[in-house]
Amino acid sequence: MGKKGKGIKPVVDNRRARYEYHIKENLEAGLVLVGTEVKSLRMGKANLRDAYAVVKDGEIWVNNFHISPYDKGNQFNHDPLRPKKLLLHRREINRLYALQREKGLTLIPLKIYFKEGRAKMDLAVAVGKKLYDKREDIASRDAWRDMERSLKERNRA
C-alpha cells in the first residue's frame, strides 16, 4: 500500500475577503474543533463570509465562522456558530493584539485547509477597502484582461 498524501487539502476559501480588504500580512494558525466539526469541515460545509478574529484574554477566537451541523451527528452535534479558538505562539498573539488595537486593522480568516491531517486557518491582518479602491481594482483587472486579449489576437495573426 502507498502512503497517504500528506499535502495541503484546501476546504474553504474566503474569496470575498481579498475584494473587501487590503491584506497586510498572513499567518497560519491551528484550529481547536470538536469531532463533528472536523467531519463537517472535511465535507466542505463551512462558511467564512462574515468571520473575524479577536484577541481576548490572551487567546485568539474566531467569531461568525459557520460550520454546518454534521448530517450523521446525533444529539452531541455542535453549535454551528460556536466561537472557535486558534492556536498560535504567545509572541504572535501579542503582536496581533497590538496590531488589532491600531485603528482600521482587523483580523480576518482567508481560508481553511487540512495540513497533515490537522485543520489550519490562514489568518490575515487587513485594512478595509473604500468603494473607490474596489472600483480601481475592477478597472485594473478589466484593463489587464483587455491587454491579454489583444496580445492573444495579435499572436494569432
From Swiss-Prot:
| Gene Ontology biological-process entries | trans-translation
InterPro entries per the record?
Answer: SmpB, SsrA-bd_prot, SsrA-bd_prot_CS
Q: Which domain of life is it from?
A: Bacteria
PROSITE patterns to which the protein is assigned, alphabetical: SSRP
Q: Which GO terms describe its molecular function?
A: RNA binding
Sorted alphabetically, the Gene Ontology cellular component annotations on this record are:
cytosol
Q: Which UniProt keywords apply?
A: Cytoplasm, RNA-binding
Please report a single Pfam family linked to this protein.
SmpB
Q: Where in the cell is it found?
A: Cytoplasm
Its biological purpose is as follows: Required for rescue of stalled ribosomes mediated by trans-translation. Binds to transfer-messenger RNA (tmRNA), required for stable association of tmRNA with ribosomes. tmRNA and SmpB together mimic tRNA shape, replacing the anticodon stem-loop with SmpB. tmRNA is encoded by the ssrA gene; the 2 termini fold to resemble tRNA(Ala) and it encodes a 'tag peptide', a short internal open reading frame. During trans-translation Ala-aminoacylated tmRNA acts like a tRNA, entering the A-site of stalled ribosomes, displacing the stalled mRNA.
> Which protein family is it in?
Belongs to the SmpB family.
Q: HAMAP family, per this entry? A: SmpB
- Provide the protein name: SsrA-binding protein
Which species is listed as the source? Syntrophomonas wolfei subsp. wolfei (strain DSM 2245B / Goettingen)
Organism classification: Bacteria, Bacillati, Bacillota, Clostridia, Eubacteriales
